[in-house]
């Protein structure tokens, strides 16, 4: 019975029917608006604990880029994947950024992690958006990309220590809609 509930929750949180970056952006903005109380106070009513002065004002969603089978195993196993030496590498790069190509995102993530292979763009073709109740550490290193127009793009990187993934921490998941 609990497995059926997890399957239903995983399906409910899947972003479906979105075919372009603008559609995914609108969907994620709506999800963020619906979840403002969670983003401000965490899934269990606690503040999202990000180890820094502040994350550019308000708390927000953080994204993990992995392939779909890896995310499913993590969700059903209730644990975060190890994709960097510090545990789980997260970023504020939204999965609908219209000026970032899938290959450039893979290149940037591969450069940022010293542990997980992002050589194949399929590794970053799928996203999971999170709001954590536990600690998340902002890294000194940044995700540096080159836009489709040749301009630099910079995003923050975060690490979450290995630990249990609570179902309420996963906000949405689905296919990325980067340029391309």
UniProtKB/Swiss-Prot annotation:
Tissue specificity as recorded in UniProt: Accumulates in young leaves and shoot tips.
Keyword Lyase in record: no
GO biological process: carbohydrate metabolic process; cellular response to auxin stimulus; cellular response to cytokinin stimulus; cytokinin biosynthetic process
A GO MF label: beta-glucosidase activity
Description of what induces expression: Down-regulated by auxin but induced by cytokinin.
Alphabetized UniProt keyword annotations: Cytokinin biosynthesis, Glycosidase, Hydrolase
Keyword Signal tagged: no
EC number: 3.2.1.-
Role noted for this protein: Hydrolyzes cytokinin glucosides thus liberating free cytokinins.
Protein name: Cytokinin-beta-glucosidase
The organism of origin for this protein: Nicotiana tabacum (Common tobacco)
Upper taxonomic lineage: Eukaryota, Viridiplantae, Streptophyta, Embryophyta, Tracheophyta
